[in-house]
C-alpha cells in the first residue's frame, strides 16, 4: 500500500531545497587522486541530483537554493534550466561566497572517495527571507536534504520551508545526506537531523546515517525495525533504510515492511547511487505505485547511474529504466 496522498492541481510535483555544487569526476580511473590529471565537471549536490533525476523522469520540478555570483553559479542554474527545472527561487549570493566543489577519486568500483571543498559556500547562505511560502504551497511535495541543516542561515531557511510545507499539506521527503565535514560535531548533527525528521513524511537514509541520528538516544541495541518505529510517532509514513549492495528496506506506519533488491550492472563508481535511487523512488510514489514497485524503480535507477561516469548527467529517463529492467538480473 502507498500511504501518501498528494494534493492535485498544483503546478509543481516536487520542489527541492538545499545544496547546489559542482562535481569534478576523475577521468583517469584505477588510480589515486594524486595521480589524476583531468576531471569532468558536472552539477552536483544530493538535492540537485535528485531534482534532476525527478525532472528527467517527467516530474514538474523546482528548486530553492543559492548560487555564487560567478561562472560556476551560472553553470549550475543554466544546467537546471536545460533540464526543465524551475530556478525562480535560486537567488545569487552577493557576499563573495563560492560554489562548493567535490573532487571524486575512482581507484576501483569498490574503492571510491570524495574530496570536498565546503568553506564559505553560497548554498549555506540561503536566508529564510528567500524562502517563499507561495512557491512551496504550489507543490505536491518538498524534498529537503540534511547538508542544508549544517549552518545558519540555511538551517533556518530549511525549517521555515518545512513549516510552510506542513501548513499547506505538502508531502515532505527527507534525504538524510550526512556529510561529516560540514558539521561541528555528531551531537549537533543528530539534534538538527532529528528535528527535521520529526516533520517529514518520508525519511530516506543509510543504516550508518540512522545510527548517527540515534547516538544521543543511548539505545542498548537498535535495528531497522526499532529505527523505523521511532519515527511513526511523529509525521513519518514511510522510512527507507538503505544497505548498499544488500538493497533496502521500507517500513510503513501500518506495520508492513518491504525489501528492495538491486540489479546487476558493471559498476564504475559507487557515488550517485543514493540520489538516483531517491529520485526514481519518489517518482514512483508520486505516480501512485505501491512501495515495492517504487523501490524497484529506485534500485534500477541506482544501478544505471553507478555504471556511468557522472551522477547528474547519468540520471535516466523512464524509458531507459524500463529497458534496463527488462534485461538486467535482479537480486533480491
Swiss-Prot record:
Pathway: Polyol metabolism; myo-inositol degradation into acetyl-CoA; acetyl-CoA from myo-inositol: step 5/7. Pfam families: PfkB (PF00294). Keywords: ATP-binding, Kinase, Nucleotide-binding, Transferase. Signal peptide: none annotated. Its EC number is 2.7.1.92. InterPro entries: Carboh/pur_kinase_PfkB_CS, DKG_kinase_firmi, Myo_inos_IolC, Myo_inos_IolC-like_sf, PfkB_Carbo_kinase, PfkB_dom, Ribokinase-like. GO terms for molecular function: 5-dehydro-2-deoxygluconokinase activity; ATP binding. It comes from the Bacteria. It catalyses: 5-dehydro-2-deoxy-D-gluconate + ATP = 6-phospho-5-dehydro-2-deoxy-D-gluconate + ADP + H(+). GO terms for biological process: inositol catabolic process. Belongs to the carbohydrate kinase PfkB family. Catalyzes the phosphorylation of 5-dehydro-2-deoxy-D-gluconate (2-deoxy-5-keto-D-gluconate or DKG) to 6-phospho-5-dehydro-2-deoxy-D-gluconate (DKGP). PANTHER family: 5-DEHYDRO-2-DEOXYGLUCONOKINASE (PTHR43085:SF49), HEXOKINASE FAMILY MEMBER (PTHR43085). This is 5-dehydro-2-deoxygluconokinase. It comes from Bacillus anthracis. The gene is iolC.
Amino acid at each position: 500500500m502507498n500511504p501518501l496522498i498528494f494534493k492535485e492541481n498544483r503546478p509543481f510535483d516536487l520542489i527541492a531545497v538545499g545544496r547546489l555544487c559542482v562535481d569534478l569526476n576523475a577521468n583517469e580511473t584505477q588510480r589515486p587522486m594524486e595521480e589524476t590529471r583531468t576531471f569532468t565537471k558536472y552539477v552536483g549536490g544530493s538535492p540537485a541530483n535528485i531534482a534532476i533525476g525527478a525532472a528527467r523522469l517527467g516530474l514538474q520540478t523546482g528548486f530553492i537554493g543559492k548560487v555564487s555570483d560567478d561562472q560556476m553559479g551560472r553553470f549550475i542554474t543554466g544546467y537546471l534550466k536545460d533540464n526543465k527545472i524551475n530556478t525562480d527561487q535560486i537567488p545569487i549570493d552577493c557576499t563573495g561566497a563560492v560554489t562548493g566543489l567535490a573532487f571524486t577519486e575512482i581507484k576501483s568500483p569498490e574503492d571510491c572517495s570524495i574530496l570536498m571543498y565546503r568553506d564559505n559556500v553560497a548554498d549555506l547562505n540561503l536566508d529564510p527571507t528567500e524562502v517563499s511560502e507561495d512557491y512551496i504551497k504550489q507543490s505536491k511535495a518538498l524534498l529537503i536534504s540534511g547538508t542544508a541543516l549544517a549552518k545558519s542561515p540555511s538551517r533556518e531557511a530549511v525549517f521555515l520551508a518545512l513549516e510552510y510545507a506542513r501548513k499547506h499539506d505538502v508531502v515532505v521527503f527527507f534525504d538524510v545526506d550526512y556529510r561529516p565535514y560540514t558539521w561541528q560535531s555528531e551531537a549537533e548533527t543528530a539534534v538538527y537531523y532529528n528535528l527535521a525528521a520529526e516533520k517529514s513524511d518520508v525519511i530516506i537514509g543509510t543504516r550508518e546515517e540512522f545510527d548517527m541520528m540515534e547516538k544521543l538516544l543511548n539505545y542498548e541495541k537498535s535495528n531497522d525495525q526499532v529505527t523505523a518505529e521511532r519515527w511513526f510517532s511523529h509525521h513519518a509514513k514511510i522510512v527507507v533504510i538503505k544497505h548498499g549492495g544488500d538493497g533496502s528496506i521500507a517500513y510503513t506506519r501500518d506495520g508492513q515492511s518491504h525489501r528492495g533488491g538491486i540489479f546487476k550492472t558493471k559498476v564504475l563508481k559507487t557515488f550517485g547511487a543514493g540520489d538516483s535511487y531517491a529520485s526514481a523512488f519518489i517518482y514512483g510514489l508520486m505516480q501512485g505505485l505501491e512501495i515495492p514497485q517504487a523501490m524497484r524503480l529506485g534500485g534500477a535507477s541506482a544501478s544505471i547511474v553507478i555504471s556511468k561516469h557522472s551522477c547528474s548527467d547519468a540520471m535516466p529517463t523512464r524509458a531507459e529504466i524500463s529497458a534496463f529492467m527488462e534485461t538486467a538480473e535482479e537480486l533480491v
